[in-house]
């Protein structure tokens, strides 16, 4: 184990102790490996503005996995996933759920496919496509994203993706009431959850829409 791996491992333990999440040792190792892969690829492909692997643990890994207890169902899509966030961390800690990770940028999907191989994940599929051109064989229990500027954009662009009784899970920083007022009448806010992300400065919310 390299010095960086050791530091990341210790840091992850400290962060997880501040949550109610139950994560196996193997999953912890996979999360660390994901940070190392992202750090390596980021130098060449500029996948994230976060440069420090320690910071990646908080802003990318913890910020993703804290959503895990709120997911209902088995079959999810992460739209505008970027370098696989929140989809890859969620897939690691939910091996019994299946995730499609969608992005329109080739270098991001190449990274995700490499990560799937390196991490030995069999519950993730990476798809290179724009969301409006992607038509799945079966609809999803949940549509996840931390990429959309507004709830209206997310529900408008992704309304063909969830099942009749499926949900949208929007990961957001600040939560503004105006966003709710912009929503089409066919969508309703089910829940707004203030997420506790250890050591993250600023608010994080999960907005669940149906």
UniProtKB/Swiss-Prot annotation:
One of its GO terms (cellular component) is cytosol. GO terms for molecular function: rRNA (guanine-N7-)-methyltransferase activity. Gene3D superfamilies: Vaccinia Virus protein VP39. Keywords: Cytoplasm, Methyltransferase, rRNA processing, S-adenosyl-L-methionine, Transferase. Its EC number is 2.1.1.170. SUPFAM superfamilies: S-adenosyl-L-methionine-dependent methyltransferases (SSF53335). It holds the Pfam family GidB. It comes from Pasteurella multocida (strain Pm70). Specifically methylates the N7 position of guanine in position 527 of 16S rRNA. S-adenosyl-L-methionine binds at residues 80, 85, 131-132, 146. Its main location: cytoplasm. The gene is rsmG. Belongs to the methyltransferase superfamily. RNA methyltransferase RsmG family. It catalyses: guanosine(527) in 16S rRNA + S-adenosyl-L-methionine = N(7)-methylguanosine(527) in 16S rRNA + S-adenosyl-L-homocysteine. It comes from the Bacteria. It is found in: Cytoplasm. HAMAP family: 16SrRNA_methyltr_G (MF_00074). This is Ribosomal RNA small subunit methyltransferase G.
């Amino acid at each position: 184990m390299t010095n960086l791996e050791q530091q990341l491992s210790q840091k992850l333990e400290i962060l997880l102790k501040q949550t109610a999440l139950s994560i196996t040792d193997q999953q912890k190792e996979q999360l660390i490996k994901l940070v190392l892969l992202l750090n390596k690829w980021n130098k060449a492909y500029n996948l994230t503005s976060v440069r420090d692997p320690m910071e990646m643990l908080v802003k990318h890994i913890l910020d993703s996995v804290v959503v895990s207890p709120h997911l209902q169902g088995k079959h999810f899509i992460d739209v505008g996933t970027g370098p696989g966030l929140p989809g890859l961390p969620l897939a690691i800690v939910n091996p019994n759920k299946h995730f499609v990770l969608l992005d329109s940028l080739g270098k991001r999907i190449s990274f995700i496919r490499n990560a799937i191989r390196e991490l030995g994940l069999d519950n993730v599929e990476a798809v290179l496509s724009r969301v409006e051109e992607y038509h799945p064989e079966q609809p999803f229990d949940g549509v996840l994203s931390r990429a959309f500027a507004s709830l209206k954009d997310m529900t408008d662009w992704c309304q063909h993706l969830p099942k009749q009784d499926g949900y949208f899970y929007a990961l957001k920083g600040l939560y503004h009431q105006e966003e709710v007022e912009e929503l089409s009448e066919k969508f309703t806010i089910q829940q707004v959850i203030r997420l506790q992300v250890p050591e993250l400065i600023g608010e994080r919310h999960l907005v669940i829409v149906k």
